[in-house]
Structures are given as C-alpha cells and as structure tokens.
C-alpha cells in the first residue's frame, strides 16, 4: 500500500477517530506527512509499540493515529483492567496487534516506543529500551487556567474543563489562577453544581472518595484557623466536586474527580513545572508562557488532531534519519 492510499484509508474512517483525536481530513494528513516525515533520509519504524494507561481513551487513539499515518505495524499494550471497550475499525486490522499483556518480543523488536503512565512507569520502560530506539514518554502533567475576566461565563467554561472525564488524564485543570481567587469561588461552585446535574461524576471506589473526604477535613481545619488564607466550597451530601481557595502560588496535586484549587496569580509562571497546558480567559495567543499548549478556557480536553503532545512533534519524534555521505575524492597534490 502506498502512502497516498494509506492516508486515503485513514481519512475514510475519520468519523471514528475524531471524538478522540479532534477533526482531521485527507488534506491535514498529507500536510503532516509532508511537514514531518517526507525527507529522503527518514526511516519509518516497522514496529511501533504503544504502552497505554487507563485514564482516558483519547491518548490511545491519538497515539495510534500517528502510527497509522506512518504505516508502522502498531503493537498496542492495553491496560489490564481499563479501556475495556477499546476497539478499532476493521479495515485498519492489518496495521495493528492488540494485547493486555506485554509479549516479550514486542520491546526487543520495537523500532519506536511510546509510553503513557506514571513517571515510574516511564523510567521502567526507558531502562528496557535500547538507546538507539526512539522513546516518547508521556508522564505526569496537569493543566492550569489563568482567568483575567472572572465572569459567570468563565466559571461555566472552567467547570467544563474540570468536569469532563472527572479530571482523569493530564489535560484536566487542577489549578485556576486569578487576581481575586476567593471571589471566584461562589461562581465556580454554582457552575460545577450545574455541570454535575447534567453530567454526574462517575462512582468512586472507597479509596478515591476517602482521599477527597480527607482533603476536605484538612481544608476545613485550615479555614477555621486561618480564614484569610483558606476557604472551602463543596458539594452537599457527596464528594461530587470540591473547590479550595489557598493563598499560595505554588500548585498542589489534587486528588482529582473534580477537585480544583483557586490561587492568586503569580508574577511569573516560569516556576511552574510539568504543565500540559494553560487555559486563558479572555484568550489571546501567548508565546511567553511555560507550557507546550496554550488554549481558550473550555477547550482543555479537545486539542487539535496531530498536536505536539508535551511539545513533541507527533510523527517526527517516531522516525530516525539515515545520513548518506557522498564520496570525497582526495585531491592530488602538486609536485
């Protein structure tokens, strides 16, 4: 199958992928190919191994789309007890192998390896990956928002970014920065309550629910003893959503499941690390912020197809290049 035929085939099943990858068409597939991997020196991987986490299916389909464009044989390691409804168009079957365990030969035969998971998972597979094999790791990251117009509309957009997928995955907002963060609390509480009514959060196991309850108790204690620096808003009778005002710029990893921090805007965002993206409201393109993705508030979970996940080009990162040097004739010396 030629590259053109393969891109035609992928474009024919775009409707299947687009809920997870964002919109693409035949033209955008060709443009990505021409931009990233059309050079004669490019060597396409024969076997591309994807080690997937169970947070959301989006990263899985986005990674697979990259491999399909390249024409690699995609070996997909699914989580043992997650992504149970993961499926693919039958016409793409020749490009894929799927397993919930990791066959021994997959790593040794991999021409490129893509891993999603914890930082510990990334270290584990990086140590097992030969140095010459392209390795792309997507580990712990989180999203933030910078809201300069704290309106009811902004609260609704933020609730969408917090609530979709229950903060599973690296794109979800965990911290919102504002000039007056405490004043935004009631607006966001109303918006999250409305979002919960329309999109109920998934049922939690005892451990996850307990983590939220423990954090709430800690925040109640702090708010009672230091009300200038702490305040808590919470869903009544459940752990459906939790909002914490903390008078500190430094982000804290939340337990997820619609738990978010409101913090004062720092004078410099450069100290923040491991960001997946920054949502802005109002939106304007900003190239001075320390994040691989800048986007309008409300669109955290919907990056464009073939985006540079974690700042890494999706196709170019998976290929290698071979340099063929011309023969240099030694010039004869003069007597």
Question: How would you describe each model-predicted region?
Answer:
Residues 1-49, 58, 265-268, 275-286, ...:
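N-terminal Rossmann-like NAD(P)+-binding subdomain of aldehyde/semialdehyde dehydrogenases
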Residues 32-95:
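Conserved small-residue-rich beta-alpha loop and adjacent elements
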Residues 165-178, 182-328:
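NAD(P)-dependent aldehyde/semialdehyde dehydrogenase
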Residues 51-54, 77-80, 115-118, 138-139, ...:
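Short His-Asn-centered micro-motif
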Residues 47, 93-181, 307-333:
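Conserved NAD(P)+-binding/catalytic subdomain of aldehyde/semialdehyde dehydrogenases
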């Amino acid at each position: 199958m030629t590259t053109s035929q393969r891109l035609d085939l992928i474009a024919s099943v775009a409707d299947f992928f687009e809920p997870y990858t964002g919109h693409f068409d035949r033209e955008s597939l060709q443009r990505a190919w021409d931009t990233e991997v059309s050079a004669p020196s490019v060597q396409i991987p024969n076997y591309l191994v994807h080690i997937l986490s169970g947070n959301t299916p989006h990263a899985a389909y986005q990674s697979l789309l990259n491999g399909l464009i390249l024409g690699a044989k995609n070996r997909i390691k699914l989580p043992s007890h997650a992504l149970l409804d993961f499926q693919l168009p039958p016409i793409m079957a020749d490009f894929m192998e799927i397993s919930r365990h990791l066959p021994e030969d997959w790593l040794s035969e991999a021409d490129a390896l893509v891993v999603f998971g914890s930082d510990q998972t990334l270290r584990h597979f990086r140590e097992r990956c030969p140095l010459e094999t392209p390795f792309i790791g997507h580990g712990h990251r989180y999203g933030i928002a910078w809201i300069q117009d704290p309106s009811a509309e902004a609260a609704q957009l933020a609730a969408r970014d917090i609530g979709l997928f229950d903060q599973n995955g690296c794109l979800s907002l965990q911290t919102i920065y504002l000039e007056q963060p405490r004043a935004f609390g009631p607006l966001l509480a109303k918006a999250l309550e409305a979002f919960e009514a329309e999109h109920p959060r998934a049922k939690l196991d005892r451990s996850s629910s307990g983590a939220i309850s423990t954090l709430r108790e800690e925040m109640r204690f702090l708010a009672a003893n230091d009300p200038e620096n702490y305040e808590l808003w919470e869903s009544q009778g459940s752990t459906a959503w939790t909002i914490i005002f903390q008078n500190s710029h430094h982000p804290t990893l939340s337990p997820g499941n619609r738990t978010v921090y409101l913090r004062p805007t720092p004078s410099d965002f450069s100290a923040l690390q491991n960001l997946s993206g920054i949502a802005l409201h109002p939106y304007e393109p900003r190239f001075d912020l320390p994040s691989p993705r800048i986007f309008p508030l409300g669109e955290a979970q919907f990056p464009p197809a073939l985006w540079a996940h974690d700042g890494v080009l999706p196709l170019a990162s998976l290929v290698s290049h071979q340099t063929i040097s011309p023969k240099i004739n030694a010039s004869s010396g003069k007597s």
